Amino acid sequence: MDPTKNVKCVAVMKNLSCFVGYDSKEDIAYRVCKHSLLKRASMDIKIFSLKLDELVAKKFYNREIDPLASTQFTYSRFLVPTLMNYKGWAIFCDCDFIFLDDIAKITENLDESKAVYCVKHDYTPKDRKSVV
């Protein structure tokens, strides 16, 4: 019996696209996130900031501003598959992430049968009407 027979891991990735949610009120957080990602990456990575004004200008985003949205990228994070032309793997993270290890490690056990991986965290909205 071959224990690897049913394993569906992706071949070793050479590059990765990383989309970071950008909020103009958190520019420094974005810069720290980007720096920590680049500093520790052992693979080629392309980092894209999801800046709302740029997405609107390129006609990728035309939603009304939601006063209950907690960040400028509350909804634009869901554009990542479209921005990737529905091909390959990409990572999205909020701008307040600090990478303490190599991002390449996250790609080691990807399974081609999965369309999305996500991390759920405990969050209680301050306002019951919040979209988060």
Q: What are these model-derived regions, one by one?
A:
Residues 9-132:
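Glycosyltransferase catalytic domains, chiefly GT-A lineage
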